UniProtKB/Swiss-Prot annotation:
Zn(2+) binds at residues 146, 149, 159, 162. Its main location: cytoplasm. Is required not only for elongation of protein synthesis but also for the initiation of all mRNA translation through initiator tRNA(fMet) aminoacylation. GO terms for cellular component: cytosol. One of its GO terms (molecular function) is ATP binding. It comes from Escherichia coli O157:H7. Binds 1 zinc ion per subunit. Belongs to the class-I aminoacyl-tRNA synthetase family. MetG type 1 subfamily. Its EC number is 6.1.1.10. This is Methionine--tRNA ligase. It is an enzyme of class 6 (ligase). Homodimer. A motif ('KMSKS' region) lies at residues 333-337.
Length: 677
């Protein structure tokens, strides 16, 4: 029977918007999607959401490296991420971004409530500062020699050689990763979230029994070592949300990132025109269930900071955190040089999504264990389980039903007791899906598949088909096989969405959890078409080789306006205000005798004439074409004596040089002498 319908909100950790989705990411999104699809099959109201984590120094700097704006970069990355997840049939109801108006408003609301409730503290701290880039440096943007083992080229927070942790100020000969400059110490006022105030609440939440044992044990270690106030602010320049009433101060990315769960759900509610559900799911006394699927590397933020922030701002806490381990490939950490650091899009160029969904699912449990993607075992397991056991069960029976009985199944079950064995397994398999013991569910299903194939082997329909007068037996045997295939595919529906679609088309019926209680009797199926193809190691070899080639391509130097000509050191507004930019009319333009680079421009500033030499001859070989145009000039630049005369200012142009120089022009309506403000 269908259970009492629950309201469930499910999230995956937000992928960072500075890189592509890879197979490590896909473990979590597949795990969550399988669980969500099962919940939907059982009749629950599930909202499944995600978003890109789109703020922080790494995004700001990478955008500069690529020569584009952060907004452009995260927009392009969001499209790529959504394409990858759609390719793996991750059934999100909404995919959003933390760089959104919903997230800004919610971040400001939560911060304001925390501040009003006395949980935000201010104090001055000393940090390493890059004097060339004019920015404070996060720990991972400082490198130097480890103070413990003296290994060179180590990050500012921990040594990858000896494992020591330390402050970036302890590094020997520290250097900025951004500019290579030697950082200096500078003071800055920062805002801190008073996490220790929530220690008692968090310990009670830990002891509630809802969290995984491994998570609860780790949290206990943190409680014993003492909780510390959490720095939630960063100084400009920073790509993120500015803190209310604190010019030049921005929310640290890890403050607004989890709020992105709320922002994405708010966006979904607004799209639906639903003004009720947001509060229904997030209010303090909500009876809806909230689950976060996350990796073990971000447990600290989700088990301490996030529930404390919610508690302190009068929102509900998560029902539970579902934490998983990492992905290794062929028994080792994913490697770019070995071609085992595989992007999601690269995988889909060589294999279908269902194959990886099945392999990951078969290995997952409710524990925080790492999952190894052994590529040879992957090929063998997909072929043995999906092709040989499940799909083959349909193909070896469908031919007889289609050819001999016009696709119509028998009106009675050949073996009702065997069918009951299959349907009785729904409770055990359902509980395994519910409790995220996915590997157990797959083992139970494959044991049934073995039983089904044994039945067909023993009944030998290919022999019966040759015996006169046994048409009814043949129809009954093959109908039984197809009904067992239907039950198996129903149990596998959360895992194999594309194969399920093809199976439903063949069976001519939708696969539902409760529907298997009634077998298909006297039912007409459609002509059988191949449901799934075998895979082989040649595809694996091509996949690995393609991943290696992508690494080579990614290592190629980045070019672009900002990459080739980086933004100069930050200036103050007072410095900028000294530059007087004016609209000027080009009254005359001519070549300069003796120069192959310069044009002589006569400019009208609306009552004052200027003579300006400009190095734009390569871009404007016909100077007469410039006469009558409006442009922008620096009007208060000191006159410069040149071999050809005195230049009384500078016209503004963009471009790398040579023929690629583009004179700037104001919009129509601007008049000579107008100041540019």
């Amino acid at each position: 029977m269908t259970q009492v319908a629950k309201k469930i909100l499910v999230t995956c950790a937000l992928p960072y918007a500075n890189g592509s989705i890879h197979l490590g990411h896909m473990l979590e999104h597949i795990q969550a999607d399988v669980w969500v699809r099962y919940q939907r099959m059982r009749g629950h109201e599930v909202n499944f959401i995600c978003a890109d984590d789109a703020h922080g120094t790494p995004i700001m700097l990478k955008a500069q490296q690529l020569g584009i704006t952060p907004e452009q970069m995260i927009g392009e990355m969001s499209q790529e991420h959504q394409t990858d997840f759609a390719g793996f049939n991750i059934s999100y109801d909404n995919y959003h971004s933390t760089h959104s108006e919903e997230n800004r408003q919610l971040s400001e609301l939560i911060y304001t409530r925390l501040k009003e409730n006395g949980f935000i503290k201010n104090r001055t701290i000393s940090q390493l500062y890059d004097p060339e880039k004019g920015m404070f440096l996060p720990d991972r943007f400082v490198k130097g020699t480890c103070p413990k083992c003296k290994s060179p080229d180590q990050y500012g927070d921990n040594c990858e050689v000896c494992g020591a942790t330390y402050s970036p100020t302890e590094l020997i000969e520290p250097k900025s990763v951004v500019s290579g400059a030697t950082p200096v110490m500078r003071d800055s006022e920062h805002f801190f979230f008073d996490l220790p105030s929530f220690s008692e609440m968090l310990q009670a939440w830990t002891r509630s029994g809802a969290l995984q044992e491994q998570v609860a044990n780790k949290m206990q270690e943190w409680f014993e070592s003492g909780l510390q106030q959490w720095d939630i602010s960063r100084d400009a320049p920073y790509f993120g949300f500015e803190i209310p009433n604190a010019p030049g101060k921005y929310f640290y990315v890890w403050l607004d990132a989890p709020i992105g769960y709320m922002g994405s759900f708010k966006n979904l509610c607004d799209k639906r025109g639903d003004s009720v559900s947001f509060d229904e799911y997030w209010k303090k006394d909500s009876t809806a269930e909230l689950y976060h699927f996350i990796g073990k590397d971000i447990v600290y933020f989700h088990s301490l900071f996030w529930p404390a922030m919610l508690e302190g701002s009068n929102f509900r806490k998560p029902t539970n955190l579902f934490v998983h381990g990492y992905v290794t490939v062929n028994g080792a950490k994913m490697s770019k040089s070995r071609g085992t650091f595989i992007k999601a899009s690269t995988w889909l160029n060589h294999f279908d999504a269902d194959s990886l969904r099945y392999y990951y699912t078969a290995k997952l449990s409710s524990r925080i264990d790492d999952i190894d993607l052994n590529l040879e075992d992957f090929v063998q397991r997909v072929n043995a389980d999906i092709v040989n056991k499940v799909v083959n069960l349909a193909s070896r029976n469908a031919g007889f039903i289609n050819k001999r009985f016009d696709g119509v199944l028998a009106s009675e079950l050949a073996d009702p007791q065997l069918y009951k064995t299959f349907t009785d397994a729904a409770e055990v398999i359902g509980e395994a899906w519910e409790s995220r013991e996915f590997g157990k569910a797959v083992r139970e299903i494959m044991a049934l598949a073995d039983l089904a194939n044994r039945y067909v082997d023993e009944q030998a329909p290919w022999v019966v088909a040759k015996q006169e007068g046994r048409d009814a037996d043949l129809q009954a045997i093959c109908s039984m096989g197809i009904n067992l295939f239907r039950v198996l595919m129903t149990y596998l529906k959360p895992v194999l969405p594309k194969l399920t679609e093809r199976a439903e088309a063949f069976l001519n019926t939708e696969l539902t959890w409760d529907g298997i209680q009634q077998p298909l009797l006297g039912h007409k199926v459609n002509p059988f078409k191949a449901l799934y193809n075998r895979i082989d190691m040649k595809q694996v070899e091509a996949l690995v080789e393609a991943s290696k080639e992508e690494v080579k391509a990614a290592a190629a130097p980045v070019t672009g306006p900002l990459a080739d000509d980086p933004i100069q050191e930050t200036i103050t507004f007072d410095d900028f205000a000294k530059v007087d930019l004016r609209v000027a009319l080009i009254e005359n333009a001519e070549f300069v005798e003796g120069s192959d680079k310069l044009l002589r421009l006569t400019l009208d500033l609306g009552g004052e004439k200027r003579n300006v030499f400009s190095g734009i001859r390569s871009a404007y070989p016909d100077p007469q074409a410039l006469i009558g145009r409006h442009t922008i000039m620096v009007a208060n630049l000191a006159p410069r004596k040149m071999r050809f005369g005195i230049s009384e200012g500078m016209v503004m142009a963009a471009g790398p040089g040579g023929k690629d120089i583009f004179l700037l022009s104001p919009d129509a309506g601007a008049k000579p002498g107008h100041q540019v403000k």
